Amino acid sequence: MKIFGITMGDPAGIGPELILKLQKDMEDENAYVIYGEEYILKHASSVLGQNFYYEKVNSVDDVKDKGIYLISLSLKGALEPSPSSGKLAIAYLARATADAISKKLNGILTMPINKYFAKASGFSFNGQTEYLAFADNKKDFAMMMYSDAIKVVLATIHIPLKDIANAINVELIKQKIKLIKDYIPKYFRFIPTIKVLGLNPHAGEGGLIGDEEAKIIIPAIRDEDVVGPIPPDTAFIDIKKDDIFLCMYHDQGLIPFKMLAFDKGSNVTIGLSFLRTSPDHGTAYDIAYKGLARVDSAGYSLELLKRYGY
């Protein structure tokens, strides 16, 4: 039996609804521990008209059999978008992360948080990915968007576009390549073909449209078994099953990914000591508790945990 953790995310968003909709996916030989509050689950269950069956426990140590469990932190907070809802989301993330690091869990699925309200609550990180790496004491990590159709890894994550050229360097790119080579065979059990994108239009056009390719990317990949630098506008024309694209910035990778796999992909943090997955969308405050949330990405994220978590 494996034990997986699922954080509720921002309770003002669609995280609680997604958890309810995953109930049938959790009716197997594994144990699933939800980090959240009972009153939130009951509210979601009432609004959506769906029964949700679980057992309350104080810690993962109390989980002895398959089923769905709830660890309540006994926190009160708003069910409307606010620093209060952001604070709850971070509390659930912190508790689940601690249990994953201590090997009490075989992996975690984190429901979406809102970066603005998380920051407003005192959270000092740009996102869950950065927090997870800090808590796990990992300096080398990366955000990977994973699907059957396309897989991308980001060299930089949540930084402004104007700062990207100064953020990339030879060491950074080598580090991301090593992460991919080490992590993918370990967790996902295949040897990837790594395709490195250029930063500039046409990958710099021989230095006519920027020199980051010549000064940074080419030196970084010269002795590596990778393909690149590839012009970003043609990189995704021909995608093979084992391809992993190393993209220089967030939207360079996320735009093609969400076009091809928005409802069938997952956000995976590579470099951690455990497997973490997350839906590839946000809190969707505008449709929360209306029964409108699509569970596809959350379901795929859970499936990855079950398939590859250990």
UniProtKB/Swiss-Prot annotation:
State the taxonomy lineage. Answer: Bacteria, Pseudomonadati, Aquificota, Aquificia, Aquificales
Specify which residues bind a divalent metal cation according to the UniProt entry for this protein.
158, 202, 250
Which terms in the GO cellular component ontology are assigned? cytoplasm
Organism of this sequence: Hydrogenobaculum sp. (strain Y04AAS1)
Q: Tell me, what does this protein do in biology?
A: Catalyzes the NAD(P)-dependent oxidation of 4-(phosphooxy)-L-threonine (HTP) into 2-amino-3-oxo-4-(phosphooxy)butyric acid which spontaneously decarboxylates to form 3-amino-2-oxopropyl phosphate (AHAP).
Mainly resides where? cytoplasm
Q: Tell me its family.
A: Belongs to the PdxA family.
Q: In which pathway does it act?
A: Cofactor biosynthesis; pyridoxine 5'-phosphate biosynthesis; pyridoxine 5'-phosphate from D-erythrose 4-phosphate: step 4/5
Q: InterPro entries given for it? A: PdxA_fam (IPR005255)
Q: Which GO terms describe its biological process?
A: pyridoxine biosynthetic process
The miscellaneous remark of the record is: The active site is located at the dimer interface.
What terms describe the molecular function in GO for this protein? 4-hydroxythreonine-4-phosphate dehydrogenase activity; metal ion binding; NAD binding
Q: Does the keyword Oxidoreductase apply?
A: yes
Where is this protein found? Answer: Cytoplasm
Q: What is this protein called?
A: 4-hydroxythreonine-4-phosphate dehydrogenase
Task: State which gene encodes it.
Answer: pdxA
